[in-house]
Amino acid sequence: MQSATPETFDEAYYQRFYFDKKTSVVDPMHVERLGAFVCSYLQYLRVPVQRVLDVGCGIGLWRDIVARHFPQASFHGVELSEYLCRRYGWEQGSVVNYEARQPFDLVICQGVLPYLSPGDL
């Protein structure tokens, strides 16, 4: 198995698997609950969150969750899909070789690993 390429995640892919309710593979409520748990736990631990990195951010489901819990935090999305980078303004990149220029307080990489080959894990 090879890791997914940017060509895999074109507009048709997202229309079919994210934006069409009949064929969607993502449950926004599940992501909402997961994100609320993660953010609430960080708040409970009193972890200061000012800068958030979401690698493999997709359509940005975590962005609004983070903003509700940490309104002062900046959110930076990195995404392999050229289509989503154009649509949402993400930085194009891959979890396999992404190198952040600055440190982040919270790094999210949810739902990405199934798209990677064993050699890229």
Which sequence ranges carry the predicted segments?
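Conserved class I S-adenosyl-L-methionine
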Residues: 50-58
